[in-house]
Amino acid sequence: SGSIRLKHIPRPSMKVCVFGDQHHLDEAAAGNIPAMSADDLKKLNKQKKLIKKLAKSYDAFIASESLIKQIPRILGPGLNKAGKFPSVVTHGESLQSKSDEIRATVKFQMKK
C-alpha cells in the first residue's frame, strides 16, 4: 500500500476536518474549514460510536503538531482503524495548502 500526490485534485469535494490549537482554529474559521479543539475531542470521551461517526463524516483529518501526540490518548484507536489518522500541520504551513495537498493525494493498495 502507498500513496501518490497528483498535480491536480481528483476529489475537490473531499471533506477535511482540522483538530487544532487556537491558531489553527482561527485559520480554519477564516478558510471555512470544519475544525475541532482538544476540548471538543475530549467531549467524545472515547465513546466508540461517536468516534466512528466522526471518522465516517470526514474523508481526512489534519492536526496541529501540539495536538498530534494527544490524539491516540483522547480518541483511542478509532481513527487508526478507519485508516484516517490525521496528518500533521505546523504553524508555518497554511491549512488551505495542506488540505489541498491531502485532496491531491491518492491512497492505493496492491493485491497479490
From Swiss-Prot:
Looking up Pfam families in the UniProt record yields: Ribosomal_L1 (PF00687)
Keywords attached to this Swiss-Prot or TrEMBL record, sorted alphabetically, are: Ribonucleoprotein, Ribosomal protein
Write out the GO MF terms. RNA binding
What's the domain of life for this entry? Answer: Eukaryota
* SUPFAM superfamilies in UniProt: Ribosomal protein L1 (SSF56808)
What PROSITE patterns does the entry give?
Answer: RIBOSOMAL_L1
| GO CC, alphabetical | ribonucleoprotein complex; ribosome
Indicate the family of this protein: Belongs to the universal ribosomal protein uL1 family.
Task: Identify this protein by name.
Answer: Large ribosomal subunit protein uL1
Per the UniProt entry, what species is this protein from, by scientific name?
Caenorhabditis remanei (Caenorhabditis vulgaris)
